[in-house]
Amino acid sequence: MDPKPINEGMLLEDHDHGMPEEEEITEDDMNGIHNIEEDTRTISEIAMELHHPNKSQVLLDQERFLPIANVVRIMKTQMDPQAKLAKDAKECAQECVSEFISFIASEAAEICNITKRKTITADDLLTAMEATGFDNYAEPMRIFLQKYRQAHKITGPIHRTHPDYVRPPQFQMDPFVRPLFFDTEQGRRCTETQYVINGSEIVKNAPLGEEWNEQTGTLNTRADGYYMEEPMEPMPMEEVEIEEHEEIIEQDSLGAIALEQQGQMQIYVDPKTKQHFAAKETPNGMELYPLIIQDTPLQLENVSGPNQFVMNMPDGRAIPHGMGQEEPQPVSSSSVMRKIGQNPSSYAQQHHHVSHVEQHDDVEYEEEEEVDQVEEDTVPVPIAPRPAATRVQPKRTPTKRKK
């Protein structure tokens, strides 16, 4: 059976079937006021529909991907002028770049939907990269964003790191990214501020010049509590909270610090050196003081006199905190060895290593015992004198006389 011929009128009829009727354009529509129902879809849903369209909807390559000429032009800037690109290489780079942009944009739109915002900022894109696993690119892009804002004198919102973001191993020892500052007619400004609404609007009469502490890279604290301080972490440390806060009240000539307990405090631990630091709020910002962790606790007592405090050691000794007395000079092990007459290497093999405290207390007793032992061992032994060597003359045979 021959197929039924299809004319142009049937194609037009089939094409127009199912198309919505054209709505009349009113005067309100011309003025920009549309009498339509409010779209209840979120930004993320719209972005996902654009990223994953329906199968029945035909989406052209010009709408899905970036222009291939622009992609090739960017690729050739990093290549030899005589080099050529294959067709599959151009299409591969075009699709990869387009999919990456769509993927990051959809995640940033979801973040804006959660925070009930309509404007996607550069910080939202960085947060989206942190959330989707592009950890190696998030921190370098944030440094670039800070320098870009400083060069163009732009102030943006404070960056909020995604909760699932973990710094890559190559960035563990690097300091955290701090905001940069630039000069304006109104004074010194920072590249990050909290007086930003929807990514572009800045609150009027905001104290932008007094918001940040440029030396410490932290937000200043005002007495009225309008904004609180959010310090940037100075180094990769672990934060530990304890129930007692220690406030510095006095410091002596040797650098020892007396502390007073008040409320809570924060302790930072350096994971590399295992050094503990106590955080202290000062007019210049947060300062870190190194702490010494000991196995046994020390008791600090108040006494009268020039030495205000006395520390009771576990072995029963009392050390004055002021240290007004002269400390005894430790005896070096080399001087003891010279008195004994032994080799330093043999002395180290026979005697185990003692601690610094034991060496101060017992070095004199060890010296006397070793000297007595050496005197007993080195008793002179009589040795018989060696007879003098006598020279033996060889026997001479008589020579024959000539007749």
UniProtKB/Swiss-Prot annotation:
Keywords: Cytoplasm, DNA-binding, Nucleus, Repressor, Transcription, Transcription regulation. Residues 363-378 have a biased composition (Acidic residues). It holds the Pfam family CBFD_NFYB_HMF. One of its GO terms (molecular function) is DNA-binding transcription factor activity, RNA polymerase II-specific. Residues 393-403 have a biased composition (Basic residues). Forms two NF-Y heterotrimeric transcription factor complexes: the nfya-1-NF-Y complex is composed of nfya-1, nfyb-1 and nfyc-1, and the nfya-2-NF-Y complex is composed of nfya-2, nfyb-1 and nfyc-1. Interacts with nfyc-1; the interaction is direct and is required for the interaction with either nfya-1 or nfya-2, and subsequent binding of the complex to the 5'-CCAAT-3' box motif in DNA. This is Nuclear transcription factor Y subunit nfyb-1.
